A protein has these predicted regions:
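Non-catalytic alpha-helical scaffolds and adjoining flexible linkers that form interface surfaces
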Residues: 1-20, 25-173
Length: 173
C-alpha cells in the first residue's frame, strides 16, 4: 500500500555502505522505520531530508509484515531553522524526539500527539516562549496520550513527602 503522509524525523543512522535508516513519526501510521537506499552516496540529496527535527512529506510503500518500509519520494514541508541557532533549544528539542522515539511503539498512530509535537517544534522555532515550559508541556501531553496523565489537582499527592528545606542556597538542582 502506498502511503503519503507528513512526518517528523526522530532519528536516522547509516545502514550498509550507501543506505540510511530513518525513524519518523507520521500522522497516519505513528512511528515508522524507513530505509532510504543510496542516500549516503555522494550524488544523492536524500540524506539531508532525514536529519532530526525536519518536518517532511513522505511517500513510501507500506507492507504490513515488515518493519522497514522503502521510501519513494520525500519533500520538505517545513524547516525550523531558528531552533538550530540556540544550543539549549536544540538539546530540549532532541530530548523531545528521543522521548517520542523511546515511548511509542511502531505503527501505533497518535494523530493528536503528532499535531502537538508539530506545534511544540514550531513554538521552539519562535523565541517568545520559554523552552523549558514547552518541554514540560510536551511531556504532559505525551503522558496523557499514553494513559499516564498525572493528577495535579490533589494537593496531598500520596506517597510523596518533600523534605523541609531551611536554607535553599545550599541546594543543588
Amino acid at each position: 500500500m502506498i502511503v503519503n503522509t507528513p512526518a517528523i524525523v526522530l532519528k536516522s543512522f547509516p545502514y550498509g555502505e550507501s543506505s540510511l535508516i530513518a525513524r519518523c513519526f507520521s500522522e497516519e501510521n505513528g512511528k515508522v522505520s524507513l530505509i532510504i537506499k543510496g542516500a549516503r552516496r555522494i550524488k544523492s540529496s536524500k540524506a539531508s531530508y532525514f536529519q532530526p527535527l525536519n518536518y517532511i512529506d513522505i511517500i513510501y510503500n507500506h507492507k504490513l509484515n515488515r518493519e522497514l518500509h522503502v521510501i519513494s519520494k520525500v519533500s520538505y514541508k517545513k524547516y525550523w531553522s531558528k531552533i538550530l541557532d540556540d544550543l539549549y533549544k536544540v538539546s530540549l528539542a532532541i530530548s523531545i524526539l528521543e522521548l517520542t522515539d523511546k515511548t511509542l511503539s511502531d505503527n501505533d498512530p497518535h494523530p493528536s500527539l503528532f499535531l502537538i509535537l508539530k506545534e511544540v517544534l514550531a513554538a521552539y522555532n519562535n523565541t517568545l516562549i520559554d523552552p523549558k515550559v514547552l518541554f514540560w508541556f510536551y511531556e504532559c501531553a505525551l503522558l496523557n496520550n499514553l494513559g499516564f496523565q498525572p493528577n495535579l489537582e490533589d494537593p496531598d499527592l500520596p506517597g510523596l513527602t518533600l523534605p523541609e528545606i531551611k536554607n535553599d542556597a545550599n541546594c543543588i538542582f
